[in-house]
Design a protein with these regions (language model features):
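Hydrophobic anchor at the beta1->P-loop junction of P-loop NTPases
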Residues: 8-10
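Short, well-ordered beta-strand core segments
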Residues: 116, 132-136, 189-191
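Post-Walker A helix-loop "phosphate-sensing" segment adjacent to the P-loop in P-loop NTPases
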Residues: 26-36, 49
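ATP-dependent small-molecule kinase phosphotransfer cores
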Residues: 39-116, 122, 142, 146, ...
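NTP-dependent small-molecule kinase module
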Residues: 2-3, 76, 82-83, 100, ...
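Walker A/P-loop
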Residues: 19-20
Length: 227
């Protein structure tokens, strides 16, 4: 394993912490970060705003034009976008088109980075099956719903916890049972239950595993770490 080409794959059900930890690890190890689910959220947003023109021809053109900055827009965060994105991600043709783009970023990140860190469905077994480190984060549904509720409340003060809870439950059933790229833990993924862990506690647990795996420290010549 080359330290300057480290690859990390993280998956989790909604609200378990994959996104948060991926960002923290990417910053610490100077890795290119990609939230793969955001690609589907971009399409979901387009479908909701312009349902009449949302067809395969449009989708193919739109996917080619998606830029990294498009993935970070706040307009992609609402719950309705996530629900629609989950539906779109079940389309085999759309998924194949997006998979190609994600693999390109995963295996050929910009040169200024030490490698890549991706989170999302099927990352550990389809997009980055040979990742140096694979993590599957989980937490009980009440905890996950609470986290998601606090996040969404910043966007919509009228949102209700029960609605978020039901949404998370439906999302779980959909993600775990769908035929195309279902949510699942691979045998070689490290399971971490974040139910009773703070963000920092979870980060340190994952960091320690990675540090032990590559046997590095802050004085390594091959991997420059960020504070």
């Amino acid at each position: 394993m080359k330290l300057n080409k480290i690859k990390i794959a993280i998956d989790s059900p909604a609200g378990a912490g994959a996104g948060t930890q991926s960002k923290l690890l990417s910053k610490h190890y100077n890795l290119f970060y990609l939230d793969t689910g955001k690609f589907y959220r971009v399409l979901a947003y387009d479908k909701i705003k312009n349902p009449d023109k949302f067809n395969l021809k449009y989708i193919k053109k739109r996917i080619k034009k998606i830029k990294l900055k498009d993935l970070n827009h706040k307009k992609l965060l609402p719950n309705e976008i996530g629900i629609e994105a989950s539906k779109i991600s079940k389309n085999r043709i759309i998924r194949k088109l997006i998979d190609g783009i994600q693999k390109k970023y995963a295996y050929s990140p910009p040169k200024k980075y030490n490698g890549s860190c991706l989170d999302g469905r099927d990352i550990t077994y389809k997009i980055l099956p040979d990742a140096d480190f694979k993590f599957f984060l989980t937490a009980n549904i009440k905890t996950r719903a609470k986290r998601r509720y606090m996040e969404l409340k910043k966007l919509d003060k009228k949102i209700k916890f029960n609605d978020v809870f039901k949404s998370i439950k439906q999302r779980d059933q959909s993600d775990y049972k769908r035929k195309i790229s279902p949510l699942k833990k691979t045998k070689d993924s490290i399971l971490i239950d974040t139910t009773h862990l703070t963000i920092n506690e979870c980060f340190n647990k994952m960091k320690n595993i990675i540090d032990r795996g590559v046997n590095i420290n802050r004085n390594s010549k091959n991997l420059k770490l960020n504070n």
